[in-house]
């Protein structure tokens, strides 16, 4: 990481226009204030300073009274307050493309001190050129950026001095994409840590390239005013570049700079190494961070650190203290055609021309660029307009503490299913897609809420050992790729049904859930006190494991009870008198032993409470593409005669159970028929399309029959198959041609060959389960009857499905309804192949905006309880 160089104290002219009285932040100077201690916690305020109710702006303004690093001198008398960080009328709007990645400051980094919630700006800044233009700008009539604060903020830019902390912007890069800016709150705190590092080290290292050669040498004479650069001190030209010079490890040993919590508290930035690390999960790919000082016009992408540092040093050495233009808010700058460069600076592969103090252009020195520049200049075009790239000093929007995130009041643990062994880290990417979709929905539908929902991935598979490599050693070599794919995906189902390895899978997920919750609470100590809620989103097999953890279901214990009952029923037909006498004594002894055990267990239960499997209560349990219903049916769960969720998941364990599935997902099954059997003939609730206007709340949607009877008092075998429309405000279409295509969204998220294999298998089952895709209205009644057979209830709990009281409109009578609907179905697309959907639908939930809206609707539901109840009449 390159760092700006040293300089003399700021000229009083910079602050003269606003009544300043001294030098402000000075990069690398001996009069620089020291900021020791923690970065993530604002714990440096002396006695009598503002506490929890005020933001410690002194950290960024350098106010007197700050604690200094050991051995540092107090030079606070040199520092002046910067009004841009305290002005009540200061306007700010983040230009960060990912600015919706929010977090809150209370309890950051292990539960440090808190800062008050700041009032949002009244008028957002809309830069005049942030959305247009290219990297190579600078032609006649080029539009310029607008600083916040209007003309009143102009005075602090009259004189060229070092960039203030609010003008610098820090960036990060993920997946080798473009640089993304941190929000203002994060950028200011990273800059604070960076300046703390500068003050604590006091080093003057020379930047070197990987070969050990200096890259920050004196500038080559390239213009009329460049000769004086050679007389500059070497350190002034090079600046402070410890990480690039290879001194990062040495600094880390000598100076302990605490990492800065950023991006909603999900990541931490290490300014010593110049990298960003996730907090709650492991990630092999490094996320570099960069300090931006000079930016490309139009895109506002930062220049590379080496070049930016050199240009900044040259700019300060040449123009320090000089007057800038009269007004910074000029909408259109004067064309530079015909202007001669007043200063030039040679870089390794480029050179920079200054046409004025704030008109700077970057040119490539590649041979092709030189030829093109020569040709265009002969055609009458200026050098800048033909091949120059306009540069800006300082970011388009200044960083402010007001640009801070909302408070997290709801966390969502995202649990993966099978296939993670084959594609480790996939759940992290899937959670990132779900988080990004949720941010878009929050900005669109829940922007007026002061709270925030955060998604955390739960990766439990990679830490398990299971059988080691035993299965791999017995796998034949033929079609090895397909076999390895099955071993890495479908084998997880075999492991979970095995009594030997099932406990390892359950404990692996249970420990990871508790670890993440404990870590989150340690970094957010007020989460539980303020009533924070926890939900779980599970996919595929993860739904079954999560369910068993919450309910404590253990097949080994049930098997032991079954064996015990069988032992108590021996065959007495061929027993002698002596054998029967001994058997009676054995029964008496066992009964006495059982009574003693029960008394002992009772004493233990009264003296200590049983530790729950999870350290938190689950508010909502969302199942996506879940086979949970099949597992419950095979365990003997049969429909009851009440419509309560407690029949399969007690409310004291989980407040709400919701089952989300795509109609063609071959792995997903319905849960409602396990509670009330006749719900197999009631259509699942259709999930609203994310851009549906004024959708009816789900709790007010009446259930409708899949096959409504002609006779309103009975359901015959030759019943019609027309679908009664659901009471939604969207246009009434058939269920197959209604709403968003989840498959189209999911084509980009086919999770490897394992998912394709599962999808192909599901496609074959779908082929035999349906007559054809060209006859969607003839959804086989035989297949429905076949699905009813394995879950047929005993005679004592059977709910009659031949005489169901319902209204003439085709809706079920409320006496036989569920307390809350559980099955929610995504809508199929207008143009969609069911065979292709069978391949892709199981992995298409992560990026769906429909799913994101559905999740957030129930998580924010407690804030909508006071809304006016809409009409219950069917649409």
Curated annotation (Swiss-Prot):
Main subcellular localization, coarse class? cytoplasm
Which residues of this protein are catalytic?
A: 540
Q: Which family does it belong to?
A: Belongs to the PA-PLA1 family.
Where are the annotated coiled coils located? none
Entry EC number(s): 3.1.1.111, 3.1.1.32, 3.1.1.118
Q: Please name the source species.
A: Bos taurus
The record's subunit annotation is:
Forms homooligomers and, to a much smaller extent, heterooligomers with DDHD2. Interacts with SEC23A and SEC24C.
Know the name of this protein? Phospholipase DDHD1
Sequence ranges of Polar residues compositional bias: 795-804
Q: In which tissues is it expressed?
A: Expressed in mature testis.
Sorted alphabetically, the keyword list is: Cytoplasm, Hydrolase, Lipid metabolism, Phospholipid metabolism, Phosphoprotein
Out of the domains of life, which is the source?
Answer: Eukaryota
Residues in domain DDHD?
A: 614-861
Tell me a GO biological process for this protein.
Answer: phosphatidylinositol metabolic process
A GO cellular component annotated for this chain's UniProt record is: cytoplasm
Give the compositionally biased regions (Basic and acidic residues).
Answer: 779-790
Q: Which residues cross the membrane?
A: none
Q: What does this protein do?
A: Phospholipase A1 (PLA1) that hydrolyzes ester bonds at the sn-1 position of glycerophospholipids producing a free fatty acid and a lysophospholipid.
Name the Gene Ontology molecular function terms of this record: metal ion binding; phospholipase A1 activity; phospholipase activity
Which reaction is catalysed here?
Answer: a 1,2-diacyl-sn-glycero-3-phosphate + H2O = a 2-acyl-sn-glycerol 3-phosphate + a fatty acid + H(+); a 1,2-diacyl-sn-glycero-3-phospho-(1D-myo-inositol) + H2O = a 2-acyl-sn-glycero-3-phospho-D-myo-inositol + a fatty acid + H(+); 1-octadecanoyl-2-(5Z,8Z,11Z,14Z-eicosatetraenoyl)-sn-glycero-3-phospho-(1D-myo-inositol) + H2O = 2-(5Z,8Z,11Z,14Z-eicosatetraenoyl)-sn-glycero-3-phospho-(1D-myo-inositol) + octadecanoate + H(+); a 1-acyl-2-(5Z,8Z,11Z,14Z-eicosatetraenoyl)-sn-glycero-3-phospho-(1D-myo-inositol) + H2O = 2-(5Z,8Z,11Z,14Z-eicosatetraenoyl)-sn-glycero-3-phospho-(1D-myo-inositol) + a fatty acid + H(+)
Which Pfam family, an example, fits this chain?
A: DDHD
- Bias type Gly residues, positions: 130-140
